[in-house]
């Protein structure tokens, strides 16, 4: 039913969902992309998620191969660009790996969209969270930085820290200041900032960090 609905009402876009598609070898993923475009010639764009830790291991040449096979954009949940914050949330990646990942994707000709979580470092690391992310995107110049405000979930280590008083939540003002810091620290990059999610205080903000 979902495929039939897409064929009738879809706009030609395909999203390879549910995790870390780019964990596949570039050869296997290329085969999938080529098959998709052969089976559904009306496809106009293919997008995928990708974890920075995996993306950093893929060469620009391999990304160029994926681009030629039909992959147009990769979304990656960086959450932060601060090593201190990344360690706090057990992200399993470093800022250096994020930068390598982004540069490799861009060098391969694929659009790159990263996600930033205002508030994920708590009040103690709110400035560090914004500063670290700014440093990372200034190095990469991703096509998009998408805002996904942190929500601390029960049954997680960070939630336990919150209950114990070891993690103090950011205020809404803190989170907006983090976004403002990202905008102010942009160094001539052409990245578009997009805040369009229901968890965000600012739900309809979008613009170029260079021209708007």
Language model regions located:
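Short glycine-enriched, charge-decorated loop/helix-capping segments at active-site entrances
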Residues: 87-92, 162-168
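Conserved SAM/AdoMet-binding glycine-rich loop
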Residues: 2-107
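Short linear capping/connector segments at secondary-structure termini
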Residues: 14-19, 117-120, 161-163, 198
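Short, well-ordered secondary-structure micro-motifs
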Residues: 58-59, 87, 124-127, 157-160, ...
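Short, small-residue-enriched loops and turns at beta-alpha junctions
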Residues: 21-24, 52-56, 120-125, 153, ...
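Radical SAM enzyme core and accessory elements
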Residues: 200-212
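Residue-level "edge-of-site" marker
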Residues: 49, 79, 118, 150, ...
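Conserved C-terminal portion of the radical SAM core fold
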Residues: 73, 96-158, 172-196
């Amino acid at each position: 039913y979902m495929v039939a609905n897409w064929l009738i009402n879809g706009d030609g876009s395909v999203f390879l969902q549910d995790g870390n598609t780019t964990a596949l070898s570039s050869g296997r993923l290329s085969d999938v992309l080529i098959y998709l475009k052969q089976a559904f010639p009306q496809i106009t764009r293919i997008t995928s998620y990708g974890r920075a830790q995996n993306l950093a291991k893929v060469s620009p040449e391999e990304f160029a191969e994926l681009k030629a096979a039909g992959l147009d954009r990769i979304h990656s949940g960086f959450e932060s660009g601060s090593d201190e914050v990344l360690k706090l949330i057990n992200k399993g990646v470093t800022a250096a790996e994020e930068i390598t990942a982004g540069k490799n994707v861009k060098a391969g000709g694929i659009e790159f969209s990263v996600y930033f979580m205002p508030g994920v470092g708590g009040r103690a690391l709110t400035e560090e969270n914004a500063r670290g992310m700014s440093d990372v995107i200034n190095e990469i110049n991703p096509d998009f930085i998408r805002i996904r405000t942190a929500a601390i979930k029960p049954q997680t280590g960070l939630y336990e820290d919150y209950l114990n008083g070891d993690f103090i939540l950011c205020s809404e003002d803190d989170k907006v200041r983090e976004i403002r810091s990202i905008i102010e620290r942009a160094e001539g990059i052409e990245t578009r900032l997009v805040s369009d999610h229901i968890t965000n205080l600012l739900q309809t903000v979008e613009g170029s960090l260079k021209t708007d």
